C-alpha cells in the first residue's frame, strides 16, 4: 500500500521550482531531460525519502523502534529461561538433599 504524502512534503515540492508547473524554467528543464533521466531522478528522490534501498520502505524511526522492542523481547525471554533453569536446579538440589537425609535416617534406624 502506498504511503500517504503529508501536506508539508507536498507543499515543499510545490514550492520547489523543479516541481512548479507554472514556472517557465521548470518547463524548459523538463524538455531538456529525457524520459530515462526523469525516471532516474524520481527514483532517486523516492529512495532518498524512504531512507535507502536496504530499509524496504520502512522509515528509520519505525525500524529502530521495532529493533529495540525486539531486543527487549529477546532479553525478557532470555531472563525467563535463566530463571526457569535456576528453579530446576534448585529443585534438583533440594530433592537430592532430601534423599540423602532419608538415607542417613534409614542407616541410623538400622544401627
UniProtKB/Swiss-Prot annotation:
Q: Does the keyword Cytoplasm feature in the UniProt annotation? A: yes
| Protein's UniProt keywords contain Transport | yes
A GO cellular component entry from the record: cytoplasm
Bias kind Basic and acidic residues: ranges:
83-111
Q: Spell out the residue ranges making up region: Disordered.
A: 1-25, 47-111
Subunit composition and interactions? Associates with the pre-60S ribosomal particle and the nucleopore complex.
The role this protein plays is: Pre-ribosomal factor involved in 60S ribosomal protein subunit export from the nucleus.
Task: Please state what the protein is called.
Answer: Shuttling pre-60S factor C23B6.02c
- Specify the species: Schizosaccharomyces pombe (strain 972 / ATCC 24843) (Fission yeast)
